[in-house]
Amino acid sequence: MKKIKRALALALAAAMSTMLLAGCGPKITVQQNGSPAGTASQDSQAAPADTGAQTTEGTDAAAAPAALTFAPGTVLRMATGYNSEKTGLFFDAETAGSGITLADGKTYNAGDLKPTWVAVEEKLGVKFENKYQGNSASKEFEYWKERLTDVDMVSGTAALLTENGIAGDLVNIGQYLDQMPHFKAYLDANPIVKLSITGDTSTGAIYFSPYFDGVNDIERMPLMRIDWVQKLLDGEGEFSADASNTTAAPVYQPYMPTSGKVEVDVVNADGTAAEKVTKDYDTAGNIVAKMNEAGEIDGVTAVNMLRTYIDEAYGGYYGTQRSDLFVGQNAAWDADELVALLRCVVANPQTLNGTDSIQGLFTREDNNNQRRVDMFRFAGTLFGVRGLESRQDYLYVGNDGAMHDARQEAATYEALGKLHDMVEEGLISKAFVDKSEENSGTYLENDLGFMHYDYNQTQTILNETKLQKEDGEKYMAVMVPVARWYDGTNADGVYMHFTESWRSVKTDGWGISVKGIGDDQDKLNAALSLIDFAYTDEGMILLSYGPDAFIKQGETFDFNGKQMPVIADATREELWEKADGNYTNYARYYLGSTLSFVKNQAFEYQCTTDIGQEGAGHISRGIALGVIKHPELEVAENSWYTSVPTILPTSTVDNNTLSGYTELTEKFSQQKDGDSVLVNIIVNGIGALDSSISDAQAAADYVSGSWSGKQYLAIKESAWQNALSYYQSQK
């Protein structure tokens, strides 16, 4: 096995100064900047604000909203974290061990607050008490659902928090927006976000604080061993090798045309402008059709067929650097071309890794359902299917303005069938098929895996920890594929780069327990102040970067047009020492940041490897130049491009009805310990849905009829129309 160990710096940053906080005394008033403003008298305690501005008869001016005041040291019992004991506000025993010293020079023990939350305590004048059970958002809320008197703030999914808020168990945060100027300003500036968290359009009720893991940017992307693509496709003359395997008997059939011409937009090679390229099927034919006609062929023949196809189909556009079709700034690859490439990769392990076996397409953890579902997400990207990377269930807004459910559409099952064909040809990893233990780290460390679909930063750090970068090994994000998408602008569809994987409100958040705070105004105001603080500039940096001791003082850099802090050298070294360069794990496990509020991507960007930045740069330029299309965080003029809200405003009656549609929840789970019938179809074929089903339309009809999909969609469509009306009324 190959692994490069990164040298670690021994010097740590200077210790962070601390401030003592009094546990009792006069009230704390939170100012407009989110900071305590000295003290206010006990009589200045804020009363709950009514929804909307209050006016007095005969006057035009609304009364100023009361400040959020609470006693110093007000305790908030927090059942909050992110899917694991390691990612709570407090150090768990495994992470802290016998004591862990961080880059701030402080030593932390099990049960201690993490540095970010120490700073929040000091900043706001609150005290946090740990109640987190270390569960996923849904399981954490279910654990506390009958114990809400014992917690003040609790994690949950957006759907669960809203459903239980409507039932009266969680505080309507929307009622207090006038007292939360920073949160309100953020929602006013991002109306689709407000729509995404509004649980009741008649009152404007909001029952949870949303979580953004970055906003308005691509989330997942394809990643490939680009050095392998270059080795197979680039250069003058024919490819040759002393040994190769034979491709499997062909099963996969063409998705793209077999004749005619298709013109698509690409970014030019130097990334400065968009241009058009033509896929000429009249001249080159379809590569899958040609390979299928040839049957089982040796790997060398397969590579030379693909080389010739690229030269002819693109009229020499890529020259001898044919790999750019897949991995270049000007990439224009599609599903058929990827299948041809996978056939070449799997049939040429002797050239690529010196063994007799390579796995083509894999997932981050082939035995973890939460990661296995990335395979059907990728299917949507490959074959032009909306709803498989939705922000809510499997919903998307069609070009007809109505809500659609991917589970009830034949195109979904056709796409999954295509991936099943790839399974039959051995192009998808055996561990994925067998649901056995294997992960992206071991695939790359042992040169056994070619590509997967995932997050850029966490996966490209494997270039530093698993690959031999100095020998040219390179795992990098590549442009999203060209597919036929039916956005309504052409009845025959549009061949274009499109991603549905777009950052908006995530499906988790934090709610305030009505029974927990009871009639304690201090607790209510402290909880509301915490949420509002997260939307100040100071709060956003603290909750993304951690405290000042982890930041290089006096230095900033330009990130998306805004000056953002630079992380301290000791922080950067510690990131590699403790988390192998994984920003998200480091921030959550050790700093306590990136939890449930607005995560600024500037920290993560600095922690991204040069290879990670290179691939992401290609994609970012594609987005900026309009080559890569994506959902929009607004109600778009063409409704097909509208991002689906994370929740839709359904009534208690609706929620009770929806909860009875258990197949739609259990059969399509994306949880770690759940089971996804969509994944099962990829592995076992369409019959995995039900043994009576033999085609895609029958599968869609089965979900619609036998599993109450039709009734589910009617409820969601009604809620969507109500949400649209509310959105228009707020403009």
Q: What spans do the regions from the language model cover?
A:
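Short helix-initiation/N-cap motifs at beta->coil->alpha
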Residues: K131-E140, A335-E337, V433-E445
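Glycine-centered hinge/linker elements that transmit conformational signals in sensory
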Residues: Y396-K430
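Short, solvent-exposed loop/beta-turn-alpha elements that line the ligand-binding surface or hinge
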Residues: G99-T101, G174-A189, K231, G235-A241, ...
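C-terminal motif of bacterial Sec signal peptides marking the signal peptidase cleavage site
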Residues: M19-G23
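Extracytoplasmic/periplasmic solute-binding protein
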Residues: S196-G214, P257-S323, N330-G398, L448-M451, ...
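A bilobed periplasmic-binding-protein/Venus flytrap-type ligand-binding module shared by bacterial periplasmic
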Residues: P222-I226, Q230, V505-D522, L542
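Conserved small-residue motifs centered on glycine
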Residues: F533, D537-I681
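Conserved N-terminal structural module of periplasmic/extracytoplasmic solute-binding proteins
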Residues: G25-A205, D213-M224, W228-T320, D405, ...
